[in-house]
């Protein structure tokens, strides 16, 4: 047998063994804390990104070393690349899509979402691409490529899984279902009108027999959340982020029907879920026009809003709006974190949210009652105070003007899409923050021409630093802040993950993967891999705990060197 045949035979044995191991995912198990798996966007439904694994801890973190590296080649039939220093290349690509003339896309290979880990297999996605990878050694088992019509390839937040089936959204607005064992397509369904310039990036969330997906648009179309049957792909319900007609609840926060129908607010990040209350919590995007409120006077519900929906019906249970009348593209899209804990001496079911606008909120997740609002950075200067419902009051003098106005934070926010973490052992909420100041100049004298993201020039003029910030949710006080060392003085935030091994993992602005002490932010270990995408994940296989991180188009798995 020649070397090529031996390599192909070896790959077949690996794929066969991995496929035999994969037995699918029971949806009922997603709600349990992640131990030997990472079955949904945040590891479980809570949004806390906390793992109970303890094999890797403060006493042995110095022995953490690289176990394997796997670079994922996006595109149609890209030649295979070795997944390890030696070994077979990638398997043939499975191609899907509805066009014979796909639009070429550059730089679509960055992993910017969650990587699922179920039964020893990693499931990874970027725009138009999905892979299965052996979680023990990084071998690519299959690759699926979607021939796209185009759209906004801003990122893909990951996949959802139900039994033996995977689901992901495409930038040209399709929901695609794959066989997890083979990568072959089961079906695909349009979920939005591509001609209206919607784009779809959200990681689908599986809740029982519901597949929850969101769709967004920065060009004046209304956003919506939808639920599909994971078996058939049939639509179960659809909830718009603006009222559908005048007279509906919330319509009084818009001046007219036209502004409401072009109001934006699409959800573009996954939410969290309470199985006891049967409520799904998520945030919506900014209203449009993004930087001018002249044509949309009012609070503009339900944009830049935290929303609770009944999973079975799609009916609104409650809402809270962190950024009323948002005119700086801040959204409220961050994944809410749900915690059961004491607040002011009483046990409460809580929802925690660090918003892009620089304010930290604590809500009662049963009723939506506001409990706490406090800035978690010194930077925010756009609010005149807090109203009786706990919402910051926008200062109209901080809207873009021809002469420019200094606003903090900038349009990217104190935090953007990178997920926070909550550690029940310390009781602290952790978030990566970036204090940046911008001058906002209005460049379009006609407010009716300021559609979408147009009509404003933003000049970033200063930065107060990148931090990891630890917040006591009971008081809103900052317990500690760790200033990220930066050669340039600027950088990007990364998501965070906490473990029961008394570790907090994240990336820094210089491209290091870092383990911190969650009690004080002291760095305990680091290694350079490039900017960490999304956030670290962790899982246990064969008695060995792995730390998984992505940077660019590459996966890095670390484990203890025994």
Predicted regions located by residue number:
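Surface-exposed acidic, glycine/proline-enriched linker/cap segments
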Residues: 89-101, 244-267, 342-344, 383-413, ...
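Blade/loop signatures of beta-propeller domains
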Residues: 24-71, 75-94, 241-248, 392-395, ...
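Blade-edge beta-strand/turn elements of extracellular beta-propeller
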Residues: 66, 141-146, 180-195, 231-242, ...
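Loop/turn-rich, solvent-exposed surfaces of beta-rich toroidal or solenoidal domains
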Residues: 433-435, 460-522
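N-terminal cofactor/phosphate-binding cores enriched in small/glycine residues
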Residues: 54-192, 499
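Repeat-blade elements of multi-bladed beta-propeller folds
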Residues: 38-42, 105-128, 151-175, 199-222, ...
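Conserved blade-ending motifs and adjacent loop-strand segments that build the rim/top face
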Residues: 324-335, 375-381, 386, 409-410, ...
């Amino acid at each position: 047998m020649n070397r090529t045949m031996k390599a192909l035979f070896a790959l077949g044995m690996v794929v066969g063994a991995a496929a035999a191991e994969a037995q699918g995912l029971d949806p009922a198990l997603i709600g349990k804390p992640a131990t030997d798996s990472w079955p949904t966007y945040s590891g479980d439904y809570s949004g806390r990104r906390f793992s109970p694994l303890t094999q890797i801890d403060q006493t042995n973190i110095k022995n953490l070393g690289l176990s394997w590296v796997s670079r994922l080649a996006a595109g149609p039939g890209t030649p295979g690349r070795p997944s390890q220093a030696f070994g077979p290349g990638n398997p043939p690509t499975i191609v899907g899509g509805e066009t014979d003339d796909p639009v070429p896309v550059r730089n679509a290979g960055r992993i910017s979402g969650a990587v699922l880990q179920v039964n020893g297999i990693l499931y990874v996605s970027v725009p138009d691409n999905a892979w299965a990878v052996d979680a023990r050694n990084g071998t690519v088992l299959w690759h699926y490529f979607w021939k796209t019509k185009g759209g906004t390839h801003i990122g893909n937040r990951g996949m959802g899984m139900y039994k033996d089936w995977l689901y992901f959204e495409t930038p040209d607005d399709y929901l695609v279902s794959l066989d997890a064992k083979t990568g072959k397509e089961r079906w695909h369904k349009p979920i939005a009108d591509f001609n209206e310039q919607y784009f779809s990036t959200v990681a689908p969330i599986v809740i029982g027999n519901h597949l929850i997906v969101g769709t967004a648009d920065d060009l004046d179309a209304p956003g919506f959340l939808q639920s599909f049957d994971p078996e058939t792909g049939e639509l179960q319900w659809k909830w718009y982020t603006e009222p559908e007609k005048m007279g509906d609840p919330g319509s009084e926060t818009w001046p007219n029907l036209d502004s409401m129908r072009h109001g934006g607010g699409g959800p573009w990040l996954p939410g969290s879920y309470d199985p006891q209350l049967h409520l799904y919590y998520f945030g919506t995007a900014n209203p449009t026009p993004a930087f001018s409120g002249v044509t949309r006077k009012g609070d503009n519900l339900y944009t830049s809003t935290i929303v609770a929906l009944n999973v079975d019906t799609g009916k609104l249970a409650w809402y809270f709006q962190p950024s009323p009348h948002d005119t700086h593209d801040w959204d409220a899209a961050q994944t809410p974190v749900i915690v059961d804990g004491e607040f002011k001496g009483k046990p409460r079911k809580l929802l925690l949210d660090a918003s892009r606008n620089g304010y930290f909120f604590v809500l009662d997740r049963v009723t939506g009652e506001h409990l706490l609002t406090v800035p978690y950075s010194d930077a925010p200067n756009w609010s005149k105070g807090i109203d009786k419902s706990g919402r910051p009051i926008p200062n109209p003098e901080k809207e873009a003007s021809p002469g420019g106005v200094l606003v903090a934070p900038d349009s990217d926010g104190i935090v953007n899409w990178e997920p926070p973490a909550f550690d029940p052992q310390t009781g602290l909420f952790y978030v990566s923050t970036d204090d940046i100041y911008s001058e906002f100049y209005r460049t379009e004298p006609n407010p009716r021409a300021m559609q979408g993201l147009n009509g404003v020039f933003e000049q970033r003029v200063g930065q107060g630093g990148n931090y990891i910030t630890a917040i006591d949710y009971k008081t809103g006080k900052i317990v500690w802040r760790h200033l990220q060392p930066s050669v340039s003085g600027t950088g990007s935030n990364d998501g965070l993950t906490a473990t029961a091994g008394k570790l907090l993992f994240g990336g820094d602005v210089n491209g290091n993967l870092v383990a911190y002490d969650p009690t004080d932010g002291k760095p305990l270990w680091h290694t350079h891999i490039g900017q960490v995408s999304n956030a670290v994940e962790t899982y246990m296989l064969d008695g060995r705990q792995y730390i998984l991180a992505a940077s660019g188009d590459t996966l890095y798995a670390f484990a203890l060197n025994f």
